[in-house]
């Protein structure tokens, strides 16, 4: 047998082809022997004739003298039974020889398969080709066996169900599968997300329910400072309603006024009624002259220290009639006021402490 010199994968394929040729040659020789055996008895009549001729010959040779008809029939039955037994034994021996030959072929094929797998670098292709060869070989062997077996009666015919070969799928445990969809992982993430959402909602609800003391000044050209207790979740409209209840006792012009007719101005910004104090606290909103999220009041920074230094101290918000603003919006301080815009940044109106940054 010549040895192939070249790549290992090509050597494996060459070995497979040689193995396939050997199997085909063995099948051809097996068929030749089978044809030779069948040619010995050409027809089915000759088979039966030979069988009964042998029985008659043995009966004649074993019968001496005159015998009764019953003895003759009994002896003939014994000879036929013995003859059939010998034929069955020969058939069993022939079947066993065929089985041993098939097992030897299969063992040689498995041995060559292991050798090819040990030498080949392309195991997947080789395995697929070998599996195809195995299937073809199994089909041929099954066909040969069916030809050797006697044809069954029509009442005994059953469909042979061949088992379907399933390829084993091996998984690599080291491969990262985090990008693949995983129902359990997604459900766990959703539960965690929902839990965090509920915790955040509870925290915000607790924050909105906290009390806050708001110092404001009723402005009619001069300031009248008052203080009211509210919740952080209350809106500016609710705050103005409470201010109105407090101021009606002192100011006659407010007795017939509704909260819609009032304005709340803080840090030179007119705050819309639908905003809540919580909105300004959470976003750390700033106005022109100070923070909008601080509602406690200190003395004016311009009175106690350098006005160029930025402070986190806020001024008292102004509560005033909208009619007063319309009459005096061209006069300071109303001329400086403007509606609050959440998209606008008011940082440029603040002055940093330059001396502090140098230190």
UniProtKB/Swiss-Prot annotation:
This is Protein FAM50 homolog. GO terms for biological process: chromatin organization. GO terms for cellular component: nucleoplasm; nucleus. It comes from Drosophila melanogaster (Fruit fly). PANTHER family: PROTEIN FAM50A, XAP-5 PROTEIN-RELATED. Residues 122-150, 339-359 are annotated as: Disordered. InterPro entries: FAM50A/XAP5_C, XAP5. Residues 123-136 have a biased composition (Acidic residues). Belongs to the FAM50 family. Residues 137-150 have a biased composition (Basic and acidic residues). GO terms for molecular function: RNA binding.
